[in-house]
């Protein structure tokens, strides 16, 4: 069913049920931004905190400009439009472009200083460290991100770890922002199976698996891409809850736990959807070694780990 007040929304090419029973808007938590106790209670209850306007629009737009200028210089935007519009060059095929964060001072200032770090220090209650790797999304028109939880990509350190999804510009329903599956962080069925997995583990007792994991460049040597489902419509029907999203603006912050299932709407515009994922934890907690250092090993060969299957 479709809510008549909303446009047609799709994810993975599938039309979402936008009836009030299946779809909703994220809860705004700016009313309790100074109350760390309530913020923690809401994170525990909702699995996310949506903070519209918290980061400040000017700082975000400065970071956006640094990104769009690089895209234009690489010929990835349409030269018939200004770089800031980020109109996609035909067949650019963009999705994930972490090099946009390399030596990017405006972006690092936004994500790893000021109000962002102040928020996590207050929320977590102590000195905070961030992962050194920045996940930069530059999503061309087409499908968005499949449903997944972050823990399967970064679960070797503390699980008291939080993602900051930061829209680098205004993202309406057509451009297609992130969506959260309501209540998914509390589902025992996911915690006992899907959320215990690690995309970089391989079966060391199976012949050929170590070589495949460490040498096959296709999909980082994965046998599995970390998604919980390829079908966000069917997944919601199976797990219940609603898909929750918003029309985001530059300056908004959406943070969530590593157990929270999330995905994104498809990009049904002509523009590139720009956003970043960055991660934060207490400095005193153990950290996943794949994502720290000047050149994090990430999902490369050094990040693989064998187990007995």
Regions found by a protein language model. Give the residues of each.
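Short, solvent-exposed loop/turn segments at secondary-structure junctions
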Residues: 55-57, 136-138, 171, 185-186, ...
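Short, charged/polar surface micro-motifs in flexible loops or helix N-caps
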Residues: 126, 139-142, 171-173, 253, ...
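Non-heme Fe(II)-dependent double-stranded beta-helix
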Residues: 2-46, 52-149, 153-156, 290-291, ...
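Catalytic core of non-heme Fe(II) oxygenases with the double-stranded beta-helix
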Residues: 118, 145-245, 285-294
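Short Gly/aromatic-enriched secondary-structure transition segments
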Residues: 65-68, 180-182, 270
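Non-heme Fe(II)/2-oxoglutarate
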Residues: 1-29, 62, 77-82, 193-199, ...
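A structural signal for short, well-ordered beta-strand segments
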Residues: 132-133, 164-166, 276-280
